[in-house]
């Protein structure tokens, strides 16, 4: 992969050595440049290798065994926990060998098969991992502000972490905490609320799961309220709730939770839209100690009386900015302020976000109490461990240029972003016809198809994933070595999030983007990002930047280097109202910042609980 930048450095059709004339000539693939007339002939795959897009999804689906798009796992798949709950709330709690007896946590027996499923087998030739280069985290800046900020930890140790959790962390091959984990673990174990500004890929999931599980393992299950349910009307009483904007992110958090609750009494569950709600209700009814949910589906379960939030000790809002961007603020406020969740003083609240604009600051002021603000520098999004290449390619030449890239060096997993669902399907079929193992994910796919596609990609059954913006944020696929922006987004923030899918966990990666005249609105933003990460700036991009500057053109997309950049600071220190620990009066009604019909996204018509037909629900 290190040679890829050199191999593709001459792909720009502005390069006159390749027959270009400053951007006007048609793109000529390298393997045809010696011929008189450029043409492109599609190779014909062997009959035994020919797979249509639909066939590939069905083949990938047989690899996963998901139940109707919902992770309805057996007791073994859930780390050994089963439904042997003592619903009366006594001191004895048993779950398939994992027990809480007389105030003591007794871990369950080891299960070699389940360990291999959860943590992988490193000796297996089909096991693919680029590893976590923890040393690359050492220079990441961290700023913590607030009253009495605890000292950060330097390594995983007990205390503060639980001994069983330490064993599971070791099984996951985590050797030392990332910067966000060094600070968040002592903050949460000290009982403080937390507002953390951290990018996806910084280890933030472990940053809230590790201390949360430590406290749950030590404190045990909460008793179910007396007369709260009868035999004919059962209800889930989770101790911890994690809200996430998309079903993809929710399932990823759930999968991580399965790892770190292995052999414990804690049983995680996940609920989200687009999957049969009956299956999810049955899973919750079997026992749910940690609930990972999207706001729309959780509101549905609350309305049906299948979930109670009365026992919530820990509330986590992951990718809070994304949830507000998607219009989820009314649903979130309904869950937190209008249901039976304990008040802010009687629960611990953790909020994680890549950015903290004003609306997120307001949400934190309402939901958090005397919180600590944590700002962690970027890991992977625009850092030097990602080699960024911007190639000038007209729309009509993109398929040829893509084949050049994939033929130059195609190792590991490649994630290709396109702007439309139709293009995702068309490009996937095109790649399959060229004998590439490709699959796609976008909003028009059923939930079962999306899960099968992701499972096939993660397992390297398909090593190319074509995706729309639904996969631009939150997806945690650690082995992606190459991100290709087949279509560049119109917002520079989206570019940052997309290329952050590679170079994860301190690893190196390559991000290649096809640029043409349709993308001039993000020229300034691209220049800033490339310069910030010490990347080579193409000549054509510099020329366009100078032309736009003379013409008074402003950078499109806004946000990242303007108003949103201010959100990475603690507003209590930088012009905010009040001092550390101050809170404004709690909002007891409907949000004043957005209508019930859509929060901050007026272009989406939906009711206060979300549109069940929306692809993001």
Curated annotation (Swiss-Prot):
Gene3D superfamilies associated with the record: P-loop containing nucleotide triphosphate hydrolases
Motif (DEAD box): 318-321
Chain ranges for the short sequence motif Q motif as given in the UniProt record: 154-182
Keyword terms, alphabetized: ATP-binding, Cytoplasm, Helicase, Hydrolase, Initiation factor, Nucleotide-binding, Protein biosynthesis, RNA-binding
Taxonomic source organism: Saccharomyces cerevisiae (strain YJM789)
Function, as annotated: ATP-binding RNA helicase involved in translation initiation. Remodels RNA in response to ADP and ATP concentrations by facilitating disruption, but also formation of RNA duplexes. Redundant to DED1, may be required in conditions in which DED1 expression is decreased.
Protein name per Swiss-Prot or TrEMBL: ATP-dependent RNA helicase DBP1
GO molecular function: ATP binding; ATP hydrolysis activity; RNA binding; RNA helicase activity; translation initiation factor activity
A GO-annotated cellular component: cytoplasm
Catalytic activity: ATP + H2O = ADP + phosphate + H(+)
Region (Disordered): 1-90, 542-617
SUPFAM superfamilies xref list: P-loop containing nucleoside triphosphate hydrolases
Residue intervals of the Helicase C-terminal domain: 385-545
The Helicase ATP-binding domain, residue ranges: 185-374
Keyword set includes NADP: no
Superkingdom of the organism of origin: Eukaryota
Keyword Hydrolase (UniProt): yes
Pfam families membership: DEAD, Helicase_C
InterPro entries on file: DEAD/DEAH_box_helicase_dom, Ded1/Dbp1_DEADc, Helicase_ATP-bd, Helicase_C-like, P-loop_NTPase, RNA-helicase_DEAD-box_CS, RNA_helicase_DEAD_Q_motif
Binding site for ATP: 198-205
The record's note on its domains: The Q motif is unique to and characteristic of the DEAD box family of RNA helicases and controls ATP binding and hydrolysis.
Similarity comment: Belongs to the DEAD box helicase family. DDX3/DED1 subfamily.
Enzyme Commission code: 3.6.4.13
Localisation: Cytoplasm
């Amino acid at each position: 992969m290190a040679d890829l930048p050199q191999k593709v450095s001459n792909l720009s059709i502005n390069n006159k050595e390749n027959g270009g004339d400053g951007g006007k000539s048609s793109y000529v693939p390298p393997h045809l440049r010696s011929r008189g007339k450029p043409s492109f002939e599609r190779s014909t795959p062997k009959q035994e290798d020919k797979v249509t897009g639909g066939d590939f999804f069905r083949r990938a689906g047989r690899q996963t065994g998901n139940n109707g798009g919902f992770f309805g796992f057996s007791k073994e798949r859930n780390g050994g926990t089963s439904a042997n709950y003592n619903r009366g709330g006594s001191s004895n709690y048993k779950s398939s060998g994992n027990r809480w007896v007389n105030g003591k946590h007794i871990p369950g027996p080891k299960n070699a098969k389940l360990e291999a499923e959860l943590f992988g087998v490193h000796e297996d030739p089909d096991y693919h991992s680029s590893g976590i280069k923890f040393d690359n985290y050492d220079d990441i800046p961290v700023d913590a502000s607030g009253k009495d900020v605890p000292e950060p930890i330097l390594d995983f140790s007990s205390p503060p972490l639980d001994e069983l959790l330490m064993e599971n962390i070791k099984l996951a091959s985590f050797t030392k905490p990332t910067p966000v984990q060094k600070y968040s673990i002592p903050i949460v174990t000290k009982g403080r609320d937390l507002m953390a500004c951290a990018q996806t890929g910084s280890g933030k999931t472990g940053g809230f799961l590790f201390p949360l599980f430590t406290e749950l393992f030590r404190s045990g299950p909460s008793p179910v309220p007396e007369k709260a349910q009868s035999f004919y009307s059962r209800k889930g009483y989770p101790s911890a709730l994690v809200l996430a904007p998309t079903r993809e992110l929710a399932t990823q958090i759930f999968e991580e939770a399965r790892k770190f609750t292995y052999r414990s009494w804690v049983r995680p569950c996940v609920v989200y839209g687009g999957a049969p709600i009956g299956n999810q209700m049955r899973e919750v009814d079997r026992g749910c100690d940690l609930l990972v949910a999207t706001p729309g589906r959780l509101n549905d379960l609350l309305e049906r009386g299948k979930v109670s939030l009365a026992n919530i000790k820990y509330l986590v809002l992951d990718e809070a900015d994304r949830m507000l961007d998607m219009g989820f603020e009314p649903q979130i406020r309904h869950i937190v302020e209008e249901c039976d969740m304990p008040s802010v003083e009687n629960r611990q609240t953790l909020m994680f976000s890549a950015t903290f604009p004003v609306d997120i600051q307001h949400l934190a002021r309402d939901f958090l109490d005397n919180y600590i603000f944590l700002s962690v520098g970027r890991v992977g999004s625009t850092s030097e461990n990602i080699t960024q290449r911007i190639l000038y390619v007209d729309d009509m030449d993109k398929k040829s240029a893509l084949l050049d890239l994939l033929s130059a060096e195609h190792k590991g997993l490649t994630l290709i972003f396109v702007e439309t669902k139709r293009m995702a399907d068309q490009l996937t079929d095109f790649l399959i016809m060229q004998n590439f193992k490709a699959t796609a994910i976008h909003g028009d796919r059923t939930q079962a198809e999306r899960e099968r596609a992701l499972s096939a990609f993660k397992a390297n059954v398909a090593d190319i994933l074509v995706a729309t913006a639904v996969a631009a944020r939150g997806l945690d696929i650690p082995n992606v070595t190459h991100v290709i922006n087949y279509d560049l987004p119109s917002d520079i923030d989206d570019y940052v999030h997309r290329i952050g899918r590679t170079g994860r966990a301190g690893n190196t990666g390559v991000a290649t983007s096809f640029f043409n005249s349709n993308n001039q609105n993000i020229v300034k933003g691209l220049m800033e990002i490339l310069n910030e990460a010490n990347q080579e700036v193409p000549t054509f991009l510099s020329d366009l930047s100078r032309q736009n500057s003379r013409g008074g053109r402003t950078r499109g997309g806004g946000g990242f280097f303007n108003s949103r950049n201010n959100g990475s600071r603690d507003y209590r220190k930088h012009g905010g109202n009040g001092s550390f620990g101050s809170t404004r009066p709690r909002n007891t009604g409907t949000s004043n910042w957005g209508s019930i019909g859509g929060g901050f996204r007026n272009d989406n018509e939906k009711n206060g609980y979300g549109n069940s037909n929306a692809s993001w629900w």
